[in-house]
Amino acid sequence: MSQFSFTKMHGLGNSYIYVNMFEEQIREEDLAIVAEKVSNINTGIGADGMILICPSDVAPVKMRMFNNDGSEGKSCGNGLRCVAKYAYEHKLVEGKVFTIETLAGIVTAEVTVEDDKVTLAKIDMGAPRLTREEIPMLGEGETPFIRENFLYNNHRYAFTAVSMGNPHAVIFVDDVENAPLTTLGPVLETHEMFPERVNVEFIEILNDEEMNFRVWERGSGVTQACGTGACAAVVAAILNGKMEHGKEITVHLAGGDLMIAWTEEGNVLMKGPAEIICRGVYEYKIEA
């Protein structure tokens, strides 16, 4: 029987099991199955996935993120805010501004602190990727951004493809509460045009500074929030002329609000909370 200490944290209800790999050990070949086991709501702790906080050669810390199906993702906005909180409060970093390595690249985090506890974290997510190769997405044609139609259930849905280190398909609807989240979501997620699968967002524009947001995450399904998805949604809204560069946009997710801005300089900034749920020790056994 193996075990490790964990901290369960969430960003707007998007919860992960966080493991401090400066202190704990999990075999590389076991990571996918451990992520699946620990995320199981019935036989594990229950979460949207597992995130490892690891040593890095290029930053104070490195984040590795696994979905609850065991697949490894390249980035996670809500996860980054929680990693920033954990790293600061456990003195893995120096100062309130620091970098975090991800599989999608290095990002900069800035934390707001009250009584030695992080209450908010702002992440510079870098510039969005908009080409088919960067997303990645199969097909022909290279326009300034990809906007395509997808026929589902005799209805044509237009989506805008954006990568924030992971792929997103953003669909604008009149009412997110009646959007085909659990039907179109998994169909588009696993469509062959997306070789690495895709996260699917449904967006309802409220005004030039607010939007409602619902998400079907690849590898996890419906979640309360998706930080990279909120970033992709704001980018897509600006690309489609629905919002403006430089403004801070309030994104209303099922789990709460994020503040997102696509700056004139080209980077996307995300600001929001990160909270601890519980701590403990998880025991597991890998069948031979």
From Swiss-Prot:
Q: Which residues form the active site?
A: C76 (proton donor), C226 (proton acceptor)
Q: Where does the protein end up?
A: Cytoplasm
Q: Name one Pfam family in it.
A: DAP_epimerase
Q: Which domain of life is it from?
A: Bacteria
GO biological processes: lysine biosynthetic process via diaminopimelate
Q: Which UniProt keywords apply?
A: Amino-acid biosynthesis, Cytoplasm, Isomerase, Lysine biosynthesis
Q: Where does substrate bind?
A: N14, N67, G77, N78, N166, N199, E217, R218, G227, T228
Q: Signal peptide: which range, if any?
A: none
According to the UniProt entry, its GO molecular function terms are:
diaminopimelate epimerase activity
Name the Enzyme Commission number(s) assigned to this protein.
5.1.1.7
One GO cellular component term: cytosol
Q: Does the keyword Amino-acid biosynthesis apply?
A: yes
Query: Which reactions appear under catalytic activity for this entry?
Result: (2S,6S)-2,6-diaminopimelate = meso-2,6-diaminopimelate
The task this protein performs is described as: Catalyzes the stereoinversion of LL-2,6-diaminopimelate (L,L-DAP) to meso-diaminopimelate (meso-DAP), a precursor of L-lysine and an essential component of the bacterial peptidoglycan.
Q: How does it assemble?
A: Homodimer.
**Belongs to which family?**
Belongs to the diaminopimelate epimerase family.
Protein's name according to its UniProt entry = Diaminopimelate epimerase
Q: Which organism is it from?
A: Bacillus mycoides (strain KBAB4) (Bacillus weihenstephanensis)
